[in-house]
Each structure stands twice: as structure tokens, then as C-alpha cells.
């Protein structure tokens, strides 16, 4: 017997019982995005490898350790996208969307990183990203955070997420801070773990978010990033904080929040939760005003964020069990009799035409009434329509409310109005 082929470790199948809650959550996210006037952009899963090296930074963990990179038959180096911002910027430049224009975009789809699989973190994961181009004030930063706060309210998880903010300043200010931080770390090199020693020169700001508690204790005496901010970045951050306070959005300033990708400047933020065990990031982003020019376009301010959907789904299921998936089926059509199946299928099409938002499933494969009603229950239907030979001949249908057990016979022409009342 041939050996079964299984999914690659860290790349998961999502079965019908799981995808229903995903669809409801994604529908909620998309509805809110539409209410703010944001438009969808669809991007390739595979990009040229240099795009990510230039955008993310060659000495980041993503590029050094986590990318799925391969050569195609032409000898070109290609990479499965590890994140969406670089591809979105590339598309904006390529199609002339960014120069002297304002764009508010979102995308959704799979990303790929070769990480150690664990709860809420996988090698293929689904991400929703939002990117805004052409606006440089703190007001658009605030709008993005307000948009995410609306998501949490709609999903019923507001009490289980907390906002952390920081400003990492201009590129010049960050370079000055980098020098001061490296000088401090050199004095205490013997107290750094191997990973932090490696990052000390290649990407020293990443030492700030080390998970090593001894390193975190050492950093209490390190230079503070906030002391090195340029005046323009200070004003921008103060403006953002003022807008969030006016909107009633609570936040904590975390001066060790730097984000893991090289393209960020000024505002960085994360929504975090402790409701999935240890603290985890639900959604994160910030400004990247230099990235468009860095990738070959004309300079354009930009800000955005991304959210891993696996972790969001886990969080919603953990803290808001009342947020359930909608039933797969509203109405189940039961047919009985040798010549009723054709009539039942034709009648089902009439009902779908009259009630386009209703989910109606027709019984197939025969079976007596008991078996067909059991199938209706399995699919979660709240109403059954019953067509037997006598109903077909009379132009009628039996409508049974599966919640109350009550049933009535109505004309086939009048069934749509009856169902509207019954289904609410």
C-alpha cells in the first residue's frame, strides 16, 4: 500500500467545521474596512527575492533564517512572500498608484516563514494587511489604530487586547541612538546571550525586544530611544497620542518597542494579548516613510499594519464563544416520492431566486423522511421544506419550523413570503 502523503509541517488544512468561523471573522474585518473607505488590492504570493532583501533588511531574522527562497528554471531567485508590505509597495510603484496620490489599501492571504511551528504561529499563515500612502500626519496613524479598535469591539475582544506605542524617530535620529546603544552593549557584552551578541552590530535595536529576562534587566540602564528623537518625530508622536486620548483609546508607551523590520520610522504600535497564554502580538505596524523611495519609487509617506488571522481566530474563540459561525444551511428541502426529485430541484431554484440571501440545501441520495430530517439537523437548518407527490401535484409545500416543530402547508407561489416571516 502506498504511503499517505501528509501536509507539510506548519502548513495546515482548515476543514469545513473551521472555515465557517474564519468566514464570519473575515467578513467582519472587511465590512469595517469598507466603512472607512479602504480598497482591496490582490498581490502575488511569489516575488523576486531582492524585493524582500531591500525592503526588510538583509540582517533581519526574516531574511537570514525564515524565507522560503528557490531558483526557478530561468535561474531567477524567487521567494514565497514572508509579509505583504513590500509586495504592496512594489505593486504601487509598478502601476503608478503612489506618486502624488493618496491610497488606502488592504490585502488578505497566505504568507510563509520557516519558523518553529507553535500555537498561533505557523510556516504558512494567513495575514490581513492595511497600507496607506500619501499621508504623513499623525491623524492617519490614529485612524488606523481607531479602525483596529473598531474591529475588536465588533469581535467582542476589546477587553482582551492592549495597545502599545512608541516612536523610533527619523532614520538619522535612530542612527544616533544605534551608536549609543552599541557603545552601551559593548560595555556589557559578557552579559548578553549569543543571539544578542550576534545582533549587537547587525541589528542592535532588536536587542531591545529580547525575550531573555537577564538582558531585559540590563537594558533598564541602557540609553533610552526617546532621548534621541528629533523634534519633528516628537511632535508627530505627541499629536498621535493626543488624537488617541480624544478618541478614548487607552495606550501604553513602550520605549523598547521597535518592530523587527528595518523599514519602520516614527510611529510603531502593537496590539497585544495575554489571553492566549504568554503575551502575544495580535496586530502590529507603523510608519515606513522611506520604503517607497528605497524600492525605486518617488518618495511618498506611508503607514500600515498587519494582523495574523490564525492568532485572531484563536483569540475570538477563547474569549468570546458567543461569536459563532453562521449555520451552513438555513433551509433543507426534503423530497419524497419516485418522481419528486426533479420537481424539488426546480422548486429550490425558484426559492433561491426569490430569497437570494438564504442558504438552501436540497436533499440528494434519497432516504426516508427520518433520514432526511436527520440530515437537516446535521447541517443546522432551522426550516425544512417538504415536497411529496401530493404537494407537487397540488402546487404546495409543507414548511416545518425545526426549532418549534410547528408546520404548515402553503402554496409554492406564497412560500417566499412565508419564509421571510419565519426566518426573520
Swiss-Prot record:
It is an enzyme of class 6 (ligase). Coiled coil: none annotated. Homodimer. Keywords: Aminoacyl-tRNA synthetase, ATP-binding, Cytoplasm, Ligase, Nucleotide-binding, Protein biosynthesis. The keyword Ion transport does not apply. InterPro entries: aa-tRNA-synth_II, aa-tRNA-synth_II/BPL/LPL, Anticodon-bd, Anticodon-bd_dom_sf, His-tRNA-ligase, HisRS-like_core, HisRS/HisZ, HisRS_anticodon. One of its GO terms (molecular function) is histidine-tRNA ligase activity. NCBIfam families: hisS (TIGR00442). This is Histidine--tRNA ligase. The keyword Magnesium does not apply. Its EC number is 6.1.1.21. GO terms for biological process: histidyl-tRNA aminoacylation. The lineage of its organism: Bacteria, Pseudomonadati, Pseudomonadota, Gammaproteobacteria, Enterobacterales. Belongs to the class-II aminoacyl-tRNA synthetase family. The gene is hisS. It is found in: Cytoplasm. HAMAP family: His_tRNA_synth. It comes from Enterobacter sp. (strain 638). It catalyses: tRNA(His) + L-histidine + ATP = L-histidyl-tRNA(His) + AMP + diphosphate + H(+). Gene3D superfamilies: Anticodon-binding domain (3.40.50.800), Bira Bifunctional Protein, Domain 2 (3.30.930.10).
Amino acid at each position: 500500500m502506498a504511503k499517505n502523503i501528509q501536509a507539510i509541517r506548519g502548513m495546515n488544512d482548515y476543514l469545513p467545521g473551521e472555515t465557517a468561523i474564519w468566514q464570519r471573522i473575515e467578513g467582519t474585518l472587511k465590512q469595517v474596512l469598507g466603512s472607512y473607505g479602504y480598497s482591496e488590492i490582490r498581490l502575488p504570493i511569489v516575488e523576486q527575492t531582492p524585493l524582500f532583501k531591500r525592503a526588510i533588511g538583509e540582517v533581519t531574522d526574516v531574511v537570514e533564517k525564515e524565507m522560503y527562497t528557490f531558483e526557478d528554471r530561468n535561474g531567477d531567485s524567487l521567494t514565497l512572500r514572508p509579509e505583504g508590505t513590500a509586495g504592496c509597495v512594489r505593486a504601487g510603484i509598478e502601476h503608478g498608484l503612489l506618486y502624488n496620490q493618496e491610497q488606502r489599501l488592504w490585502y488578505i492571504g497566505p504568507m510563509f516563514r520557516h519558523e518553529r511551528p507553535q500555537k498561533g504561529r505557523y510556516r504558512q499563515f494567513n495575514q490581513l494587511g492595511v497600507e496607506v500612502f500619501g499621508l504623513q500626519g499623525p491623524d492617519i496613524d490614529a485612524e488606523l489604530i481607531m479602525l483596529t479598535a473598531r474591529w475588536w469591539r465588533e469581535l467582542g475582544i476589546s477587553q482582551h487586547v492592549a495597545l502599545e506605542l512608541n516612536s523610533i524617530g527619523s532614520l538619522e535620529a535612530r542612527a544616533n541612538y544605534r551608536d549609543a546603544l552599541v557603545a552601551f552593549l559593548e560595555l556589557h557584552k559578557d552579559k548578553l546571550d549569543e543571539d544578542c551578541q550576534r545582533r549587537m552590530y547587525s541589528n542592535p535595536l532588536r536587542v531591545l525586544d529580547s525575550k531573555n529576562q537577564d538582558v531585559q534587566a540590563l537594558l533598564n540602564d541602557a540609553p533610552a530611544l526617546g532621548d534621541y528623537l528629533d523634534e519633528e518625530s516628537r511632535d508627530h508622536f505627541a499629536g498621535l497620542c493626543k488624537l488617541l486620548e480624544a478618541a478614548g483609546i487607552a495606550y501604553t508607551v513602550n520605549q523598547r518597542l521597535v518592530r523587527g523590520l528595518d523599514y519602520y520610522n516614527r510611529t510603531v504600535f502593537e496590539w497585544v494579548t495575554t489571553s492566549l497564554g504568554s503575551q502575544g502580538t495580535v496586530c502590529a505596524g507603523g510608519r515606513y516613510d522611506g520604503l517607497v523611495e528605497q524600492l525605486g519609487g518617488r518618495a511618498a509617506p506611508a503607514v500600515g499594519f498587519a494582523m495574523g488571522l490564525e492568532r485572531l481566530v484563536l483569540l475570538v474563540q477563547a474569549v468570546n464563544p458567543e461569536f459563532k459561525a453562521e449555520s451552513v444551511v438555513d433551509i433543507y428541502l426534503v423530497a419524497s416520492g419516485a418522481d419528486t426529485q426533479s420537481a424539488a430541484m426546480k422548486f429550490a431554484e425558484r426559492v433561491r431566486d426569490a430569497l437570494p440571501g438564504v442558504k438552501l440545501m436540497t436533499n440528494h441520495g434519497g432516504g426516508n423522511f427520518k433520514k432526511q430530517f436527520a440530515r437537516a439537523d446535521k447541517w443546522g437548518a432551522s426550516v425544512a421544506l417538504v415536497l411529496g407527490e401530493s404537494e407537487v401535484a397540488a402546487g404546495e409545500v409543507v414548511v416545518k419550523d425545526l426549532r418549534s416543530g410547528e408546520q404548515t402547508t402553503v402554496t409554492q407561489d406564497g412560500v417566499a413570503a412565508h419564509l421571510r416571516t419565519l426566518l426573520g
